[in-house]
A protein has these predicted regions:
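Carbohydrate transferase catalytic cores enriched for Leloir-type hexosyltransferases
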Residues: 1-364
Length: 364
């Protein structure tokens, strides 16, 4: 089977969630089947596996409407796009499109790196579900990363196509920390500082944890930082890192007592999986997607209760609790692997090929 992966959503500086998802799947697929990829910028190759590639137009350009004509000439057995926006006019190949989550219907703020006209279209697009249905129904099979999103897609009737889970996963090759070594009195938050992320409640909980340091790792605007600094309780220690490298992120996680996320809404929660894979327990808000991802490797609390968050941290201090929580975290993270996701994608690809052939012959 020759799988062509649309890697044009790969960043040129550092991975974001979509970029890492695509690159990791390409690497795992290439070990299993003939794999090639589409790019639109040579700089993307620095963050992608060494597989054959073809350079085409940007997925954000008007030429996207005609990209299928270029892909037709490559004669792939099946095409996988880690987004749902790939142009399909005139396509003559089986296609899998991806919807990661429905978070932007609740919180429609577009990513800042998008051009202004695209940001406007983004907001309009997320005001109703019918545009999503139009995009997804162009595929033969639709992929998503979680059972939670699959359920939401069914609830909103977003597609008539089969929906298959091709999950996210932590990066390979990371050795978990020693569960019997005492953790540092530190807590980690990795993620944006949008209001729904509820970082204020985490900061408020530090009032009851004066012996801990809260590390806020992500990049943050000066205005948002000033807002959060203003609510740091007296005696609490909160460190704003303003962005960290991959190595710095891992080093801080390896020392910490726990990773914390009290988000009220989430698309997936990759930092939870990353933390658990290193043996660092997670304290998370009690929402469905975190229940699915965190499983037995997380402690769940009311996202509106700073006291419940602080109590969960103190519970980890009890004799024998943290070492067992660390082992539970590693076991839970082990349920998510890129090998498993690649196998699921190959199964979805075979299904897409059969459905495409059936539709071409008028049987579906």
């Amino acid at each position: 089977m020759r799988i062509l992966v649309d890697a044009r959503f790969t960043r040129t500086d550092h991975h974001d969630g979509i970029s890492r998802y695509g690159a990791s799947l390409i690497a795992a697929l290439a070990e299993r089947t003939e794999t090639a990829m589409l790019i639109n910028d040579e700089r993307q190759l620095a963050l992608l596996p060494n597989v054959p590639h073809v350079k085409v137009s940007s997925p954000l350009s008007p030429a996207e409407l005609l990209v299928a004509a270029k892909v037709n000439g490559l004669n792939p057995d099946v095409v996988f796009c880690p987004m749902q926006t790939m142009g399909t006019w005139g396509r003559r190949y089986p296609l899998i499109l991806t919807l990661h989550d429905l978070i932007y219907y609740e919180h429609p703020e577009p990513p800042g790196f998008l051009p202004a006209p695209v940001r406007l279209l983004w907001r309009l697009y997320h005001k109703a579900y019918w545009p999503q249905r139009v995009l997804l129904n162009r595929a033969d099979v639709v992929a998503t990363v979680s059972h939670t999103t699959k359920w939401l897609m069914a609830e909103k009737r977003l597609t008539r196509r089969p929906v298959r889970i091709v999950g996210n996963a932590p990066q390979n090759g990371r050795e978990p920390r020693n569960p019997d070594a005492s953790p540092a009195p530190s807590l980690v938050y990795m993620g944006s500082f949008m209001p729904y992320k509820n970082v204020e409640t985490v900061i408020a909980g530090m009032r009851s944890l004066p012996d801990y340091t809260l590390h806020l790792l992500s990049r943050i605007s000066p205005e948002r930082r000033a807002e959060l600094e203003a609510v740091v309780p007296p005696g609490a220690t909160v460190e704003f890192h303003g962005g960290v490298t991959e190595d710095e992120y891992e080093a801080i996680l390896r020392e910490a007592t726990a990773l914390v996320s009290l988000s009220r809404s989430e698309g997936y929660g990759l930092p939870l999986v990353e933390s658990m894979s290193l043996g660092t327990p997670v304290i998370a808000s009690d929402i469905p997607i975190f229940r699915e991802v965190g499983g037995d490797g997380a402690r769940f609390v009311d996202p509106d209760s700073a006291d419940a968050f602080a109590a969960a941290v103190r519970e980890l201090e009890l004799p024998g609790v943290w070492p067992e929580a660390s082992r539970d975290a590693v076991r839970q993270a082990g349920t998510f692997t890129w090998d498993r996701s690649a196998d699921a994608l190959i199964d979805a690809a075979e299904e897409a090929i059969e459905l495409f052939r059936a539709r071409r012959t008028g049987r579906s």
